[in-house]
Amino acid sequence: EMCIRDRLVNSHLDRFALSEANVETYRTPEYMLSSVQDYRPGAPGYQQHIWQATLGNRAIVYTNHPGGKNLKYSPNYWAGNEILPRAAQHKNVVVCIYNIPENQKNDYTHAYFPKNDFDEVLTKGNWTFGRKKDGYVALYSQNATTYQAGERGDICDLLALGRQNIWICETGTKTEWGDFTKFVNAISSAKVSCQELNVNYTSPSIGNVTFGWQSPFTIKGKEQELRWKY
């Protein structure tokens, strides 16, 4: 059944149109994790900010598919997305899948993860970890990542080459985990299996997570609703 919104807005033709956004936010005293669920995946983007982990005023983490280097326009290197991903969140875990078509010149995705704004940052395997006071964040990239300097010279740009990529973000706290090292070791040793545009991740905190470009979002085998029912 087609709703009025679907008849009026073609997300692949009108990147400026406003459409329904199902936002999920999970907040503790140490961090906030927020995302928009299954928002026009594969469609051209504009200024949409799909997800973000916030551990402080400047200690933030998010990913995007850049639209260009010129920061005066949107989408640009840091603001918005040239092609929108498919994202889903349950509590403290976000999965974000990018599927960039061949006709797009920017064949990579990247994360904003500013080293100097965290108290600790380290890399272990495909994971990058950060600590800000008693808040912890972990970011996984299916594709290999390299850190590079941003336009102001600060090391904040975590680049991942490839048109298809799966990113996972998990957050935690000292209260839950104790030492930051325990958080790092538990998540870096957790099972992550990526096949094409599907992922199976065994989160140490919420259990088994599965998601795909065309597959449902499940937690411990139970499908999760990505569109709110009013």
Name the predicted role of every residue range.
Residues E1, R5-Y230:
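Ser/Thr/Asn(+Pro)-rich, low-complexity disordered segments
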